[in-house]
UniProtKB/Swiss-Prot annotation:
Region described as Disordered: 549-672, 704-743
GO BP, one annotated term: gonad morphogenesis
Basic and acidic residues bias spans: 563-581, 594-621, 633-647, 654-664, 727-743
Lineage: Eukaryota, Metazoa, Ecdysozoa, Nematoda, Chromadorea
Domain of life: Eukaryota
SUPFAM superfamilies hit by this protein: Cullin repeat-like
Encoding gene (name): cogc-8
Species this chain originates from: Caenorhabditis elegans
Protein name per UniProt: Conserved oligomeric Golgi complex subunit 8
Complexes and interactors: Component of the conserved oligomeric Golgi complex which is composed of eight different subunits and is required for normal Golgi morphology and localization.
Cellular component GO terms, alphabetical: Golgi membrane; Golgi transport complex
């Protein structure tokens, strides 16, 4: 084509002119520029293509390089990938099997559904009382646990565990049958079902039954809390519940039941002896009795309890239980005795505080005490206070309060509380004397008040104590040989000692000593005072016996067995009224040997009298004797000369004794040797000094220490709280020492 064009152009060039050639030249030049432009565009486009190709080549090289690097470790991971595929295959197979198991389990005809309902059936059996079926289900649960292959299944494991754990719930439900009213036949069935349970010993069964009975007992006590007669109701509840439990226990657990040993126990281990069945029951009874006594004590703190009714009910309850082989009367007696002692001590302290706590002056009625009537009481009647006591209203109120406290002891008049009673009264009198000396020593009625306390109140309290606790009864109960003198010394409210031990003793002793000063027989006027009103009814209370050495003469005085209580009280009243101790120092220092017929007066002098040694009194104590009414016998002898003949005396012996008495009065310089009227006095046989009262508590403690009493339940002469330092710690004083103190 180009050759054709060039050919034509050559023809044209030859044929065209210059203008035309110029025009063609311009056209060619423009076409050349267009071609150059196209060439430039083509060159530019080719460069971009080359650049893109280069970048693509670089990227491809990089990509292939990375691929090469990654494919290098692919061979190393091929083994791990293979094992992962194998594991995946196994899991897929297991999942397929489980899927198949679930599909079978969803079938309602599968026995697994019955197995899953066993826990709920177990609960229904327990609540409905089908204890035999419940026990069978628990045994089935144990069998499932023993089958290892089945127990590995989570469903079966859960069911088996629930059935076994329900055994504790079954036991609790069975034992709860005892936490309510008892039915003996039903209770026996329950115990038989409980005995089927393994790993439950006989003692555990007994203790569990008693514990659930305590739960029921506590529920009943809570129901009556706050009632007015709560204590009486509580005692009745304790009695009924404990009796029912005792009957059930003896019916279910007989005494002759043989306790079997555990065959699985290793004989090489140390084994403790098995307790007998009754020991558990006894300890349970004692524990409940202690709870009941604690309940009574707490209730008594809030408000006073009628201890008389409580004592009666508790003793009746203890007696009924004692017939069944469980006697807890010593425990009740010990606890209630302490409670009664505490109440008596508190009542006396309150009465004393009411008297001494008032800041009022001592106000008394201005009546001459001599114009007041004198009361005489029958031998067996309660003592009557002196009429002078009614002149002081505050003291009358105090005395009545103490008498009320003593009357509160009527239902438990045991010598065990005697020490507490005496100590409380002594402390009360001492507090009153201290109050008078510290607050009312300047009062116009101070001396009169002290006299009333010393001569009216204290003797009246002594009579009350002796009336409530007769010496003969105390000696009979304890089998003691304590004489009446020792007993009266023990309960004596010694005003001299109390006055000396109180604060402001100097002021009190100035008044007490003259009141209690002993007077001679001549000062008293014994002939007029002791003159018998009915001589025909009076009988001598002493007799003389002949001895081998002395022949007809003096013998030891012996108290007649038929001596009445009235004669004893007459002696005591005369001693209190006249302040005279008929056992003078003369009779205290005389030896117990009879006086020989030809004994000279020099043998009775002071130098030849036997020395008084208190420490030897306990070695050879004389035969105990009752206090004698010496003054009455002397008066009868003075007014009835025939009495000497009745006593076996001769006129010669009478003259000798009169002369001896006269010599004693003349030669003796001791203050306690008083002048005696020979016309009215009869020589009294000398009485040896009796031992002091200190050994009483020891003897009684030894006598009763073997009693079956709970620990810390003492049955001795009083308790540890009732110590009296004045009597127990003081030795018997000789007449010489007494005279020195009186001076």
């Amino acid at each position: 084509m180009d050759s054709d064009y060039i050919f034509h152009n050559g023809d044209d060039i030859r044929n065209m002119g210059l203008e035309e050639m110029r025009r063609q030249k311009v056209l060619l030049a423009s076409e050349l520029k267009a071609i150059d432009a196209q060439i430039s565009d083509l060159a530019f486009n080719n460069y971009g293509t080359y650049a893109d190709a280069g970048r693509a080549t670089h990227d491809c090289s990089k990509t292939f390089g990375e691929m090469r690097d990654k494919t290098v470790n692919l061979s190393d991971q091929a083994e791990e990938l293979t094992s992962a595929f194998v594991e995946f295959r196994a899991k897929a197979k297991q999942l397929s099997e489980e899927q198949d198991l679930v599909r079978k389990a969803l079938d309602k005809s599968n026995p697994i559904w019955e197995l899953l309902t066993l826990p709920s059936r177990m609960d229904i059996c327990i609540r409905a009382g089908y204890y035999d079926l419940a026990y069978t289900l628990t045994n089935y649960g144990l069998q499932l646990q023993q089958q290892t292959q089945l127990y590995r299944n989570p469903l079966i494991k859960k069911v088996a565990d629930h059935l076994v754990e329900a055994r504790a719930y079954l036991l609790e439900e069975l034992f709860n049958k005892f936490a309510g009213p008892l039915d003996l036949a039903e209770s026996i069935k329950v115990v038989n079902n409980v005995r089927k349970m393994p790993s439950l010993t006989a003692n555990q069964l007994r203790i569990a039954v008693l514990q659930h009975r305590d739960i029921y007992l506590e529920k009943q006590i809570l129901d009556i809390s706050g009632n007015v007669d709560m204590i009486v109701q509580a005692i009745e509840i304790y009695r009924t519940s404990m009796y029912d439990t005792l009957v059930l226990y003896l019916a279910v657990f007989p005494e002759n039941e043989v306790v079997r040993k555990n065959p699985n126990a290793d004989p090489r281990w140390e084994s403790w002896p098995v307790l007998p069945p009754n020991s558990i029951l006894s300890q349970w009874v004692i524990s409940n009795v202690k709870k009941m006594l604690d309940l009574i004590t707490k209730a008594d703190v809030k408000s006073a309890v009628d201890l008389s009714a409580v004592w009666t009910k508790l003793m009746a309850m203890a007696s009924s239980f004692g017939r069944m082989g469980i006697d807890f009367r010593p425990l009740i007696a010990g606890k209630l005795t302490k409670l009664i002692e505490q109440r008596f001590r508190q009542n006396v302290q309150e009465a004393t505080s009411r008297l001494t706590g008032s800041s009022r002056d001592i106000v008394m009625i201005g009546i001459d005490p001599a114009s007041l009537p004198q009361f005489e009481t029958a031998p067996d009647s309660p003592p009557v206070a002196a009429a002078e006591l009614s002149l002081w209203d505050d003291m009358t109120i105090y005395t009545n309060s103490v008498v009320d406290a003593l009357n509160g002891l009527r239902f438990i008049l045991t010598p065990v509380v005697l020490s507490t009673v005496v100590v409380s009264l002594r402390d009360s009198i001492r507090s009153i004397l201290t109050w008078l000396a510290s607050s009312h020593s300047n009062s116009a009625n101070f001396s009169r008040a002290v006299r009333i306390v010393c001569t009216s109140v204290a003797p009246f309290f002594e009579k009350c104590v002796a009336f409530f606790f007769p010496p003969a009864t105390v000696s009979k109960i304890f089998g003691s040989s304590i004489s009446k003198r020792q007993y009266l010394q023990f309960i004596e409210l010694d005003m001299k000692q109390l006055a000396a031990s109180c604060d402001g003793a100097e002021k009190i002793e100035e008044i007490v000593k003259p009141l209690l000063q002993k007077r001679t027989l001549e000062e008293i006027g014994l002939e007029n005072v002791l003159k018998p009103t009915k001589p025909e009814e009076e009988k001598t209370k002493f007799f003389l016996e002949e001895t081998v050495e002395d022949g007809p003469g003096l013998a030891e005085p012996q108290e007649e067995a038929s001596e009445s209580v009235k004669e004893q009280e007459t002696t005591s009243e005369l001693e209190k009224k006249h302040g005279t101790d008929f056992e003078t120092a003369e009779t205290q220092e005389m030896v117990s040997e009879p006086v020989k017929e030809h004994e000279t007066t020099s043998e009775l002098t002071k130098e030849q009298e036997p020395a008084f040694e208190p420490e030897k009194l306990h070695e050879t104590p004389p035969e105990p004797m009752e206090p004698q009414n010496f003054g009455e016998s002397e008066a009868k002898a003075a007014h009835n000369p025939e009495a000497h003949l009745e006593l076996g005396e001769t006129s010669e012996n009478q003259e000798i004794r009169e002369q001896e008495h006269k010599e004693v009065v003349i030669t003796s310089t001791e203050p306690e040797f008083h002048e005696i009227d020979l016309n009215s006095a009869v020589l009294i046989p000398k009485i040896a000094v009796e031992p002091q009262l200190d050994p009483i508590s020891e003897y009684l403690t030894e006598l009763t220490q073997d009693d079956p009493i709970e620990e810390e339940e003492g049955w001795g002469w009083g308790d540890d709280d009732g110590e009296e330092q004045e009597i127990s710690s003081k030795e018997v004083e000789s007449p010489k020492e007494k005279c020195k103190k009186d001076d």
